[in-house]
Amino acid sequence: MRTKTLSLFDSFYGKISPSMFYRTIAAIYLFDFLDRLRARKYPRDWYSILERELDGLISNFSFFDRSFDFSANDFAAWSETDKNFDIEKKTGKVYFDLWKNFGKEEFFAQALSALKDRFEKNGISVSSVNDALDDGCGSGRYSFALKRLGCARVKGIDISAEAIELARRMSPFPADEVSFTQGSVLKLPFGDESFDFIFSNGVLHHTKDDKKGLKEIYRMLKDSGRCWLYLYGGKESLFWDIVDLCRKLLSTVPQGYTQSLMRDMGYPPGRIFHRTDFFYVPLNKRYFASEVEAMLKDTGFGNFKRLKRGVQYDWDEIIYENPGIDPYIFGEGEMRYLVSKK
C-alpha cells in the first residue's frame, strides 16, 4: 500500500502549479486529510477516498485558473533569504514564531491538561520530584505544567533566546521555583546528576546529534531519577509520507505566508502550530521502536518502558481506541518512553 500511495503522491505533485497559493492550499488540505479520516473512524477504504479527494483538488485548482487572474500578483514580499542557517537556531525560530501567537489561557491550559492526562494514563507522578529539567523547553508551557503537577523546582533550557524571553515573561512563578536558560540540549550547562526528572518532549529528533543529546540526559540524571522521552515514531507511515509531500510542496513557500493563510482561513493558533511544526522545522527524524531502544541501551540506560496511552489526538491513543486501523496510517505509533539508569 505504501508503494501505491507514494506513486499517487508523485503524480499529484507533478500536477500542482508552482504558485505559492496553490502549493500552500494543497499542503494544508493534505495534512487535514488525516483529520477527515479520524472523523470517519479510519475506514479501510481510505486510499480510494484519498485518490478521489486529490483528483477533486486538482479540478478545483483548474476552476480557479479559469476564474481568477493571478498573473499580476506579487509574492516578493514573502520571500526569504536565509538559505544558509544554523539548524538549532532555525528550529528555535520556527517554534518561537508559532508560540508567540498563543493567548495566555491557551498557552497554559492546553499543555497542563495534556500532560496531566498523559501522566495519569501511564501511571506517572512527579509530586515527589525536587529538581526537574525541561530539556528544550521552548516557551515554557510544559515547564509551568510540570511545576503545577508537583515538581518543587523546574529549570527550562532552549536554543532560542526569543523563546526564553517569552517564557520568562509568561511565567507566573518566582525565579527560584521556575527558571529559564538559553543553551543547547547537546551541551547543557548543568552539573552531573543534577535532576530527579528530565522532560525531553519532542526535541532530540530536531537535532543534528540525537545520541549526544541522550548522553547529556544520562549525565545529568540522578541514579534514582527518571526521564520522560518523546521522539517521533511512525516511521514509513502514511502520516510521514503526507508530511514529506507537504514539505516538498512548501519548500519554496515562506513560513509566514503559510501561517497568514491559515489564520485567514480561520485556523486557531493550536492547529496552526501543529501543522507548521511539521512543515518547517529543518530536521524531523523518525524512529522505529527498535532504533530508540538500541540508542537507549547504547547510552547506558538500564531501564525503559514504552508508554502507549495519551490524549485523544495522540497516535497511540488513536491506535488504542481503533484496534482495526490500517497499520500503515500511523505505523508503530509514537515513541514515548519512561527511562531510568537502573
Predicted regions and their residues:
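A short acidic, Gly/Pro-enriched loop at the edge of an enzyme's catalytic core
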Residues: 186-197
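Acceptor-substrate binding/catalytic loop of class I
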Residues: 275-291
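Conserved class I S-adenosyl-L-methionine
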Residues: 226-258
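Conserved alpha-helix/loop element of class I SAM-dependent methyltransferases that forms part
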Residues: 105-128, 145
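A short glycine-rich, Lys/Arg-flanked "PGG" loop and its adjoining helix->strand segment in the class I
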Residues: 211-223
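A short SAM/SAH-binding and catalytic strip from SAM-dependent methyltransferases
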Residues: 197-208
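Class I SAM-dependent methyltransferase SAM/SAH-binding core
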Residues: 133, 139-186
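N-terminal, positively charged/glycine-rich alpha-helical extensions of SAM-dependent methyltransferases
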Residues: 5-100
